[in-house]
Regions:
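Generic ordered-secondary-structure signal
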Residues: 14, 142, 323-324, 331
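A generic alpha-helix surface/boundary motif
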Residues: 18-19, 150
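Generic low-complexity segments that are intrinsically disordered, proline-rich and/or Lys/Arg-biased
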Residues: 1, 19-22
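Bacterial N-terminal signal peptides
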Residues: 7-18
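N-terminal accessory segments that precede or flank the first globular/catalytic domain
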Residues: 21-82, 237-239, 243-310, 315, ...
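Residue-level signal for short amphipathic helical patches enriched in basic/charged
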Residues: 147, 320-321
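Soluble extramembrane regions of membrane proteins in the secretory/endomembrane system
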Residues: 25-251
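Positively charged n-region of N-terminal signal peptides that target proteins for export
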Residues: 1-7
Length: 333
């Protein structure tokens, strides 16, 4: 009887062993990765993009969690955008469609495989699924502090049992938001001019390495050298990095447009010529005053509106209001 009992127990053990191995192998086959996408040509794509890829081959899952979705069709979009009340949302799309879209627009994509254990993988998946619930997926977008790059970083850090230690950045505390904006607006002078016009002195303060991660490629570089510490064990945050969409950027086929500097020089020359002409003719050219004071006054109205009412970061302390201010409209002829 005793031998029969032991035989039954041993048989059950053999039957359960493959199941346990299958579960472990299934968990081990799950891969979670940080995706970093190259910049595009449209102004809201100039800084690149970040997303999280979730692969579970045993269940046929290969999807991308994307915190960068918004719609121009929402009511009063332009007003809400100027007020800094633009709501973004988390979306989920299958990876082939995601990769195909970026390849179509000539934007490369890099993948960094996250070095998470099974518990951390399960926790990150749970956090993403919880965040994707209809009542949780919408969030108030903030360009510098809460965007499509900072959200994935925060969720990944939240899922890790230990602490993520980022490598010491030589430029930590020496760079500013404005400098990073200039870096990504290279080749787009009017975008740089418009952003420079709107953001104030707060954008010129030195920022930390963590604050630099609002830009996707700064986040990618930080992840590449980051370490996870906990229980006296240290491991890299990223185990593998690869270029998964190798795309050729679209050629710029737009017609020539003068830069802001060229436009300013042209305006100066025309104004000087009109002034000389008016002095020699002993006549006032009210049209010139109308253009100059009208343009400066309208620009001042926009800057004052942003400084007083907008939730956008770094727009309240804008000293350009001393140059462009609404009061100049009072001097219109």
């Amino acid at each position: 009887m005793k031998r029969s009992f032991l035989y039954v127990i041993f048989s059950l053990f053999l039957l359960l062993l493959p199941i346990g191995q299958t579960t472990a192998n299934s968990n081990d086959s799950i891969r979670l990765s940080l995706l970093t996408c190259a910049p595009g040509e449209v102004i809201y794509t100039l800084f690149g993009h970040t997303a999280i890829r979730y692969e579970n081959p045993s269940q046929g899952i290969d999807v991308v969690f994307n915190y960068g979705l918004f719609s121009f069709d929402i009511p009063n979009f332009a007003l809400r955008f100027s007020l800094g009340e633009t709501d973004y949302r988390l979306g989920v799309i299958d990876y082939p469609h995601f990769a195909g879209e970026y390849a179509y627009f000539g934007r490369s994509v890099w993948q960094q495989t996250l070095n998470l254990n099974n518990e951390e993988k399960a926790e990150l998946i749970r956090l993403l699924q919880e965040n994707y619930r209809p009542e949780n997926r919408v969030y108030r977008y903030n360009f510098f502090y809460d965007n499509c790059a900072t959200r994935p970083r925060d969720k990944i850090e939240e899922s890790i049992a230990g602490k993520v230690i980022y490598p010491v950045e030589p430029q930590d505390g020496s760079r500013t938001f404005r400098e990073i904006v200039h870096q990504y607006c290279k080749g787009h002078p009017w975008a740089r001019f418009g952003i420079d016009l709107c953001i104030g002195s707060e954008a010129d303060r030195p920022i930390t390495q963590r604050q630099m991660m609002f830009a996707p490629f700064y986040l990618m570089d930080a992840f590449a050298g980051a370490q996870i510490t906990g229980d006296s064990i240290q491991r890299p945050l990223v185990t593998d990095s690869e270029l998964i969409v190798d795309a050729t950027p679209e050629e710029d086929e737009s017609f020539w447009i003068p830069t802001p500097l060229q436009s300013a020089l042209l305006l100066f020359i025309l104004t000087a010529a009109a002034t000389i002409y008016g002095i020699r003719r002993r006549t006032g050219l009210w049209g010139v005053d109308l253009i100059l004071f009208g343009t400066a006054g309208i620009a001042g109205c926009i800057l004052a509106f942003l400084a007083l009412f907008s939730e956008h970061p770094a727009v309240s302390s804008n000293f350009l209001l001393f140059v462009f201010h609404p009061g100049q409209l009072l001097f219109l002829p």
